[in-house]
Each structure stands twice: as C-alpha cells, then as structure tokens.
C-alpha cells in the first residue's frame, strides 16, 4: 500500500513516550491510545508488568512495548504514529481510539499485514455508536474488534416492548451520535409508537430555564406529560445533573418512569442515580461475570491479576472504564498467542516496515500471527474473550436494574433481569403490585378494536387516544367504583390471541402472558385454552355465534332499459341497421323500381336508412320496394327485427322485475349445507378454533361442524378466512360471502348499517361469555368479578347493553329482504334512462329545426325583388295551349277556367329525372310547366312540344330570363300566383316563325 507523501511533512508535535525494547527481546507490541485515555495507558502497563512476572506464560521472553497518544478523531496523526511503530518492528498493534481513526488504522494494518486489535472508545463515558468498519470477505482483514458490537438498539427495544410503552421521549447528550439508535427509532416507528427526541446541552440549568421562559402553561403541562416516560442516552455525570434539575423544578412527578442506558455505568453511578430520582427508574448497563469465591476474583487460570484491578474495594477498580478492562484482556490474549507460537516453534521474527516506500513489502509472518490470535481465547476481567469468523467478539451481557414506584427518595434498587444476544431477556421487568386498596393504582389495559365493544372516539395529534364502547363502559364502571386508573393501548398485532407452534401466545392474551399488560378487555371470549394461561373474571355478557349475510336488494340503474343486451350486442345491432340500410339503397340503385305515375317517393340513402330503422322499431316505413331482391332483404330483416325485439322485451321484463325469494339460509345448519355462498371467520380466532375442534372431533354427532370446517379450512384457511373482523364485514357488503363471527358484534353492525344491507342468523344458545382477562394469579380477579355481578343484579349492565344494542333499531336484523322493496311497482329510477333518451331526442330535434329555419331564411333572402318580377297572362297561355292540343277543326277550343288549380311549388323539392312523367316539357321553347293541367288532359302534355315546334317559326333567342308568374283573377285584377314560392322558373321569349306573337296588351305579358 502506498501512503501519501504528505505524511513526510507532518510535524512531530505530539507528545510520545517510548519504552524501547532490549536488544535481545523478540516480543515487541505497539499501542496507540486517545490522548484523553490516560487510564488506558496505566492499565496497559499494568497488564504487561503482570504478564512479565508470570513465568508460566512467557518463561524466558519478556514483552516490550511502545505507546503513543493521538487525537482520537485525527486519522492522519494515527497513521503517522502507526508507521513509526511499524518501522521499529512490532508483532501486533493495540489501539483504543475513536471510530474515525480506527478506519485509517484498519487500512494500514491490512496493507502491512500487522494484526490490529481495536478497542472502541467513547468520548467522556457517552454510550457508543457502531463504528461500521468495513469487513472484507477475503483473508486480508487484519483488524480484530475486541469490544463486542453495540447492542443498545436491541436491548432498549426489548425493554420498551416489555413495558408496553406507546409514547415516550429520548434525551441524549451533545457528545452522543444519535445515528447510533437509528435502527431502534425505525422499529418503534413501524410499531406505531410516538417517540420524541431532545438534545441535552452541557448547561442543563440554562436549558431548563429556557423551557419555562418560552413555553406557555398549556405547552408546559403537555411537556410534563411527555416526561412521564423517558429514555436517557448520556454519560452518567450528565444523567445525574439532568435528573436533579428536572426533579427540583417539578417537571416530573412520582408516577414517572425513566430508563437510563449506558455501558459505562458502575455501582457508584447506580447508587447516585437512584438517590436523585423519583418515580420508577430502570438502569441498563453492561456487566461482566465475577467469581463467586472472593479469594479467586484476582485469578484467571494460571494468571494472577493485580489487586488494584480486581478488588471491588479498591478505588482504582471502582472507577475503571469498560475500555480499561478490554485493554488488560487484550494484552493477556496476545501473551497467550506468543506463548503458543513459541511452543509450536513457528515463530516469525519482527521486521522493520516502512509505510513510505513504494515497494515496501508487508510482514511475512502477519497471517500466521493473526490466525494464532483468532484461534486463541482467554478468560479475563471481561469474561471470555474470543473472536468469531467476522473478527468480532460476540460475548456481551447486559444487566437490567430497577426500582419500584415510590414517593420517598433513596429507594432500593434490585436486579430485574439480564439480556444477551443469544437468549435475549431473562427475567421479568414488571414491578410489584400495590396493596389491595386500588386507589391510585394505574393499570395497563390492552385491547383489540371491535365494534361496539372498543372503538376509537377521539384521536387528536399529540394527545392520547380516547376509546368508547360497551367494554369501555364496563371498565369505567369498575374504575369509578374501585378507584383505579388505567392506560389503554391496542395489541400490536390486533389479535385476541392464540397459541403458536413454539408454545407462546400472540395478540391480547400474549400481552398478558408476557406481563406487558395488567388487564385485557374487548370482545374476548372465555375459552379453556385461554384460561390455562390467564385468569378471567365472571362473564359480563353472553356469547353466541352468528352469521352475517347481505340482503337481496335491487340494483338501481337509470339505464336499466339497456341492461337486457350487452354493450357488444348493442353495437352489433347498430351496425346491422346501418349495413342493411346501405344494402337496400344499393339494391334499389342497381335495379330501380318502376313507380306508378304520380308517385312522389324517392329511394335515397337517407330514406333507405329511415325505412330500415322504422321497420326495426316496428313503426313501418314510407318507401315501397317492389324488386325481388329488396323484398327478400327486407323479409329477412323483419324476421331479424321480430326476434330481436321479442328477446329484448322478454329480457327487459326479467331485468326490471326483482325476484324476491326469501333466502334459504336461516341458521348455521342451512349455511353448512349449501356451497353457493362461501363463508369463513377470523383466522386463529376463538370461532375458528371452536369450529376446528368440533369439525375434527370423530365423536361429534352433529355433521354441521365437519361441513363447516371443510369450507373454512380451504387452502389451509387462507381462502375464505380474514385477518380482522372488519375485513370480513366489508367482504360481505361488497361480495358473495357470509361471515361467521360473534353474534353481538354482527347484530351491532346490522343495526347501524346506513343502507340496512345486512341481516343475521345464528344460534341463540349462549354456551360461553365475554370476560375480562388478567395476568395469571392477579389479585384483582375476585374484586372485578364481584363488581360485575353487582352491576348485573342492579340492572346497570342491561342499561349499558341497550345503549349499544337498541331494541328498536333503524334496520331489521332478521329479514333477508329489504322491506322497502317488497312492492311490485317499478319506480322512476328503473326507467330513468328511457326518459333521458327521449329528452336527448327532443333537444336534438329542436336544434335541427332551428338550423333548418336559419337555412331557409338565408336561402330566401336571395330571391329577386318585386320590381324584376314579370307577369304572365296564364289565361292567354291556356288558350294557346288549348289551340295547339285540339284538333284542326277546333282551333279555338280553350281550357275551362275552373280547371286551373295553381298550388305552391318549391323547385328544390321537384323529383329527380326518374319521375319525368310528372313534368310537361316544352323542350324546343324552353318552357316548363308543372302539372297544374287537369288530369283528363295530362296525356296531351307529351305532344305539346312537337305541336309547338311544327306550328311556330323560331327566331333568334335574344336573352334568357327567369322570374315568378302572376295570373289574372276572375275579377280582372292581378294577384300573385301560388307558384310564386320564393323560387324561379327559367324561360325564353318565343321566336316569331311567320306568326305575329308580339306583345299584345290584351293578352298580357308574354313569356
């Protein structure tokens, strides 16, 4: 490894003390200590002296050493000093410094192959945080951690869980790295605990004074409530000062409970902390095994330890730090490793190593020495010191000390339990119960949310949750009579409790078994299995099993008229209408029908579509079709429409008419016999265990339970069962499911459902009951049972029941059909979609009418003015036409005036070329007239053109004009002809072919 050349320019301004080895010594070790750890240096020298005097370990060889002091948080200085030690030649490096410098020494030791024994040291007795040294999976990791890993997260989490704290505050001093308990904070947050953090400054008095100056009375009271549960992560000196300040300023009361955790707390610190505190105090510290025989306390095998280190009465031993003990055991471990190497004659001489040279080689004997140290082990002041595969010391033990609640200062302290990574907590942290007088007793109550037994009534941020319900009313009645107070919390797993495979219990019962709660109350049934592990009061309410089902109800859909057909079928029908209409149009276009004279019909695409749609809705059509192909097409279409309309009508009646058949499930027996509706219960609940026990019992006569168990146990219970009762209720409400559960709970749900969509069936025989669970051997069982009997005899219990289960509820519990739907008439909601379709058609037709009116007015505005109108003497025209159309001997025959019948005519609406029979043409004269000629002479209209052509000589046509016509009234006046309908007829002047057809005043205006 190449070290930066910058190290060459570092000044040697740090004080160092060297104890040089004698020229013939082959055992030389180096030590680097924090400059504030003077006691580490003293213990190190004492350990070397004790071992040099022990001729059984090192017979002829003596240990020499070199010690240097550095700033624990200066990695450059630590590397510089380590290089100086390696340059002298050392077999191993011992360091007692901070984590920052330890990482640099780890890299240097790995490069030089020097065994490095690291003792983590905290600043001024503050609790340690994990160093997080990088461990390589290869064999080139030469750093061994003498002190065990930091287990503060695991220990404090176990203790807080044992005490069942839900809200507390953590105080830590300014020297502590709060990241050390990050894992603990994450886990308690996942469990829903309310945790606050506050840093304690060095000037504690000033900090407390600032709190009183800045907080209002309400805020200060809330802060006092927070201090009832607190954890102190700080050095012993700061903890003593902090406790004294908060006690003197009355920030804490006698009901407070504080936990102090620190590996460095000694016996003197424990006595002082207990003396200054009030309320309950729990102390967590690291402990080491001590021989029971006093005379053997200073002996570890064949080695004798100096009395100043092992005698509890010695002042030096009383004030020793944890790192001092591990320093001594480290030297003892190295001495035994050296002895092992000498015995095996596998000794590797020391080598002078240079960190600065680029081509410097590591020590060849480093790997062999490291393996000897790792495989060895000693029993010293800290107990067994050995290393695992990861290079760490796994042996650690914590001691949990505590006091009981009390008002007087200076209470006694006792050992509550111990903790280690292998077995966990050993012991009970529950304090002793007070006397039978329950005045002032605070009980911890665990519950499970279950309507209407226990429900959350108020959940305000920053305040404890408030609960209500039937069980809470019973608990309040007991509390008011007996005088105790209680703190309530919800079971972490929200379960009532059932035995596990390892013999433990979970849920509410598990909280009582592990003594984390004093009382358990909810919809908790009394069962034989539960009575084996906890105590129950007398039942305060009867219990029976019920079934929750959903009523048969009508589905309201405003577009129910569309329900008989699927959306895809509607789309196919619409496409079929368009397709058939198009085919009808094409067939008539390819083979047009021959219509009778005078018919005004037209087979356009629009008319074809309209005809197809009209026939589909059975309203007929206006366009007659005479071709064989078209008629075959329409015949098939009419048959299709008949079947579709008939199917729609029948299916619509089925959809709009509700079949109100009473449910066949009226009991548990009915439920077990059917398989259409799946059913289940809460997994591992009392109902689940009851059905399982009955269903698997070969001597059970009733087959109902075996049938129910087969349904409930599908897929090992995961298919039809739920984890919570609320999930089962929701499953019934929104699916095809029946929920088997406590009848009292189901009745409350059915009564208070806003939609009245539930009904219940079940067994009315109460073979069990609900009770209050207590710890096994609790002194409160009898007094609770007695008070419950008094409430039942006085009728107060019935009053509480009627509060939550009223007799006259808004819903019927036992009817499987909604009473509101028993009528036979359809309501407006069922056919609202039809009205919507009609309204849409009306609105659309009105819009089209407005557009047509606008278009007609716009088109009419283009008609020429009255000044440009030309008048025509239609009577003169009639005479001339009559003269042309009659025989030669009757040249003066005229039409009867009464035969002239002029009707309004819109040129735009004239038929197409296919109806030419309806129009009389004067082809050569460019005069076109409509069929206002009487019917009896219509046949003459076709010869009119030829006669005119032969009887007149055409001259040049000077111009082509258009204009409306007028004719004379019988009284000789003029009036506008009915043909004057905002349209024009083209005409040209008739040329003179030998006849004088000029303008004649008597004949009126000519065309």
From Swiss-Prot:
Gene Ontology annotations for the cellular component aspect, listed alphabetically: dendritic spine; glutamatergic synapse; ionotropic glutamate receptor complex; membrane; parallel fiber to Purkinje cell synapse; plasma membrane; postsynaptic density membrane; postsynaptic membrane
Extracellular topological domain residue ranges: 24-566, 657-830
The protein's name: Glutamate receptor ionotropic, delta-2
Role description: Member of the ionotropic glutamate receptor family, which plays a crucial role in synaptic organization and signal transduction in the central nervous system. Although it shares structural features with ionotropic glutamate receptors, does not bind glutamate as a primary ligand. Promotes synaptogenesis and mediates the D-Serine-dependent long term depression signals and AMPA receptor endocytosis of cerebellar parallel fiber-Purkinje cell (PF-PC) synapses through the NRX1B-CBLN1-GRID2 triad complex.
Positions contributing to Ca(2+) 1 binding: 531, 534-535
Single Gene Ontology MF annotation: transmitter-gated monoatomic ion channel activity involved in regulation of postsynaptic membrane potential
Region (Interaction with CBLN1 homotrimer): 24-345
Highest rank taxon of the organism: Eukaryota
Source organism per UniProt: Mus musculus (Mouse)
Main subcellular localisation: membrane
Database matches in InterPro entries: ANF_lig-bd_rcpt, Glu/Gly-bd, Iono_Glu_rcpt_met, Ionotropic_Glu_rcpt, Iontro_rcpt_C, Peripla_BP_I
Positions occupied by motif PDZ-binding: 1005-1007
Gene (UniProt): Grid2
Phylogenetic classification of the source organism: Eukaryota, Metazoa, Chordata, Craniata, Vertebrata
Subcellular location: Postsynaptic cell membrane
């Amino acid at each position: 490894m190449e070290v930066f050349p910058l190290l060459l320019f570092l000044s040697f301004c740090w004080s160092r003390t060297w104890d040089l080895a004698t020229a013939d010594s082959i055992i030389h070790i180096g030590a680097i200590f924090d400059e504030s750890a003077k006691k580490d240096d003293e213990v190190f020298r004492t350990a070397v002296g004790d071992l040099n005097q022990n001729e059984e370990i090192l017979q002829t060889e003596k240990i020499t050493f070199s010690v240097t002091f550095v700033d624990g948080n200066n990695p450059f200085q630590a590397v510089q000093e380590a290089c100086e030690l390696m340059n002298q030649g050392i077999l191993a490096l011992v360091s007692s410094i901070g984590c920052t410098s330890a990482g640099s020494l780890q890299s240097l030791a790995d490069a030089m192959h020097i065994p490095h024994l690291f003792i983590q040291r905290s600043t001024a007795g503050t609790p340690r945080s994990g160093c997080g040294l990088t461990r390589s999976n290869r064999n080139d990791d030469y750093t061994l951690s003498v002190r065990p890993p930091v287990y503060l997260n695991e220990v404090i989490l176990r203790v807080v869980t044992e005490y069942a704290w839900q809200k507390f505050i953590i105080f830590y001093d300014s020297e502590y790295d709060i990241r050390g308990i990050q894992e603990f904070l994450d886990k308690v947050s996942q469990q829903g605990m309310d945790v606050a953090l506050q840093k304690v400054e060095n000037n504690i008095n000033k900090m407390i004074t600032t709190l009183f100056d800045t907080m209002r009375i309400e805020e200060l009271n809330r802060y006092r409530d927070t201090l009832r549960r607190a954890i102190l992560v700080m050095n012993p000196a700061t903890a003593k000062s902090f406790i004294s300040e908060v006690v003197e300023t009355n920030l804490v009361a006698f009901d407070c409970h504080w936990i102090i955790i620190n590996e460095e707390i000694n016996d003197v610190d424990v006595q002082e902390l207990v003396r200054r505190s009030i309320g309950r105090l729990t102390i967590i510290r690291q402990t080491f095994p001590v021989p029971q025989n006093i005379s053997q306390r200073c002996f570890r095998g064949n080695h004798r330890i100096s009395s100043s280190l092992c005698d509890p009465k010695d002042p030096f031993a009383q004030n020793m730090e944890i790192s001092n003990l591990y320093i001594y055991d480290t030297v003892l471990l190295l001495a035994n490793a050296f002895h092992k190497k000498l015995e095996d004659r596998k000794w590797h001489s020391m080598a002078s190593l240079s960190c600065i040279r680029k081509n410097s080689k590591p020590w060849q004997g480093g790997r062999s020495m490291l393996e000897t140290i790792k495989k060895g082990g000693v029993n010293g002041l800290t107990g067994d010191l050995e290393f695992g595969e990861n290079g760490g010391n796994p042996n650690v033990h914590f001691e949990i000390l505590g006091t009981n609640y009390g008002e007087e200062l200076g209470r006694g302290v006792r050992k509550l339990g111990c903790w280690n990574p292998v077995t966990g907590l050993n012991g009970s942290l529950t304090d002793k119960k007070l006397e039978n007088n329950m005045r002032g007793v605070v009980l911890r109550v665990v519950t499970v949310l279950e309507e209407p037994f226990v429900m959350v009534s108020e959940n305000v941020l920053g305040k404890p949750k408030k609960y209500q319900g039937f069980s809470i009313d019973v608990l309040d009645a007991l509390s008011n009579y007996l005088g105790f107070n209680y703190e309530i919390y919800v079971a972490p797993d929200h379960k009532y409790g059932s035995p596990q495979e390892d013999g433990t219990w979970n849920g509410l019962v598990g909280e009582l078994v592990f003594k984390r709660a004093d009382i358990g109350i909810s919809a908790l049934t009394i069962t034989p299995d539960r009575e084996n592990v906890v105590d129950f009061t007398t039942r305060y309410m009867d219990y029976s099993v019920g079934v929750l089902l959903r009523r048969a109800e009508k589905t309201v859909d405003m577009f129910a008229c569309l329900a008989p057909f699927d959306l895809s079928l509607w789309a196919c029908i619409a496409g079929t209408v368009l397709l058939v209409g198009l085919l009808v149009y094409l067939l008539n276009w390819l083979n047009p029908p021959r219509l009778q004279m005078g018919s005004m019909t037209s087979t356009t695409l629009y008319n074809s579509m309209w005809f197809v749609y009209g026939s589909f809705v059975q309203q007929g059509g206006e366009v007659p079709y005479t071709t064989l192909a078209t008629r075959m097409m329409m015949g098939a279409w009419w048959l299709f429409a008949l079947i579709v309309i008939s199917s729609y009508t029948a299916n619509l009646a089925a959809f709009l008419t509700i079949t109100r058949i009473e449910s066949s499930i009226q009991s548990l027996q009915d439920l077990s016999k059917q398989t259409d509706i799946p059913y289940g219960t809460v997994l591992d609940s009392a109902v689940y265990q009851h059905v399982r026990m009955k269903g698997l019992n070969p001597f059970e006569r009733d087959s109902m339970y075996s049938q129910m168990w087969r349904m409930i146990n599908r897929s090992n219970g995961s298919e039809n069962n739920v984890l919570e009762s609320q999930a089962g209720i929701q499953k019934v409400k929104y699916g095809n499911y029946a929920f088997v559960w406590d009848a009292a709970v189901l009745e409350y749900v059915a009564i208070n459902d806003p939609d009245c969509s539930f009904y219940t069936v079940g067994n009315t025989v109460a073979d069990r009951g609900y009770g209050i669970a207590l710890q096994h051997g609790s002194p409160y069982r009898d007094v609770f049972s007695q008070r419950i009997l008094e409430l039942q005899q006085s009728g107060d219990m019935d009053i509480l029941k009627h509060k939550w289960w009223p007799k006259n509820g808004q819903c019927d519990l036992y009817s499987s059909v909604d009473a509101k739907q028993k009528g036979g008439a359809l309501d407006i909601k069922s056919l609202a979609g039809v009205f919507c379709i009609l309204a849409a058609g009306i609105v659309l037709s009105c819009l089209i009418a407005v557009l047509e009116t606008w278009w007609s007015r716009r088109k009419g505005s283009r008609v020429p003015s009255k000044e440009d109108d030309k008048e025509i003497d239609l009577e003169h025209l009639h005479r001339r036409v009559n003269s042309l159309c009659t025989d030669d001997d009757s040249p003066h025959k005229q039409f009867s005036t009464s035969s002239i019948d002029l009707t309004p005519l819109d040129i735009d609406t004239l038929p197409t070329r296919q109806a030419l029979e309806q129009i009389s043409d004067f082809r050569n004269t460019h005069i076109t007239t409509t069929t206002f000629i009487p019917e009896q002479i219509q046949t003459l209209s076709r010869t009119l053109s030829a006669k005119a052509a032969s009887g007149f000589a055409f001259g040049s046509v000077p111009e082509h004009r258009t204009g409306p016509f007028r004719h004379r009234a019988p009284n000789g006046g003029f009036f506008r002809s009915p043909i004057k309908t905002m349209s024009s007829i083209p005409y040209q002047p008739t040329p003179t072919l030998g006849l004088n057809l000029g303008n004649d005043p008597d004949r009126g205006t000519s065309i």
